[in-house]
Amino acid sequence: MALHSAIKGKLISVIGDEDTCVGFLLGGVGEINKNRHPNFMVVDKNTAVSELEDCFKRFLKRDDIDIILINQNCAELIRHVIDAHTSPVPAVLEIPSKDHPYDASKDSILRRARGMFNPEDLVR
């Protein structure tokens, strides 16, 4: 059983290394849609950047996906595609991998979100 948005029945997708994908699959995120397309992609050293980019674009177009989790090191390879995605849904969240820790300075989505808030609004 996959983790679904309670109201709409939407999915979380995962793009990342084998350990990341297996962890989320064990947590119940894995699904295959009616066209037999999974909601995850395992990326390894032999994965072409074009494959990664195509998968990300497919996930963006799927109406059953609300959140895309992507290892930050994978996101760096397709940064131009991620930066071009400005719609709030599906939300794109960059996550660390086992071998690559999270670096907030590389996360363009976090930078964009920070720009939406006035620092004085956060101080009380």
UniProtKB/Swiss-Prot annotation:
Gene Ontology terms: biological process: proton transmembrane transport
One MF term in the entry's GO annotations: proton-transporting ATPase activity, rotational mechanism
GO cellular component term, pick one: membrane
Modified residues (Phosphoserine): 87
The keyword Transport belongs to this UniProt entry's keyword annotation: yes
Keyword annotations from UniProtKB, A to Z: Hydrogen ion transport, Ion transport, Phosphoprotein, Transport
InterPro entries for the chain: ATPase_V1-cplx_f_g_su (IPR008218), ATPase_V1-cplx_fsu_euk (IPR005772), ATPase_V1_fsu_sf (IPR036906)
Pfam family for this entry, one: ATP-synt_F
UniProt family annotation: Belongs to the V-ATPase F subunit family.
Function statement: Subunit of the V1 complex of vacuolar(H+)-ATPase (V-ATPase), a multisubunit enzyme composed of a peripheral complex (V1) that hydrolyzes ATP and a membrane integral complex (V0) that translocates protons. V-ATPase is responsible for acidifying and maintaining the pH of intracellular compartments and in some cell types, is targeted to the plasma membrane, where it is responsible for acidifying the extracellular environment.
Subunit structure of this chain's protein: V-ATPase is a heteromultimeric enzyme made up of two complexes: the ATP-hydrolytic V1 complex and the proton translocation V0 complex. The V1 complex consists of three catalytic AB heterodimers that form a heterohexamer, three peripheral stalks each consisting of EG heterodimers, one central rotor including subunits D and F, and the regulatory subunits C and H. The proton translocation complex V0 consists of the proton transport subunit a, a ring of proteolipid subunits c9c'', rotary subunit d, subunits e and f, and the accessory subunits VhaAC45 and ATP6AP2.
Protein name, entry field: V-type proton ATPase subunit F 1
Organism listed in the record: Drosophila melanogaster
Top-level taxonomy: Eukaryota, Metazoa, Ecdysozoa, Arthropoda, Hexapoda
Name of the gene this protein is made from: Vha14-1
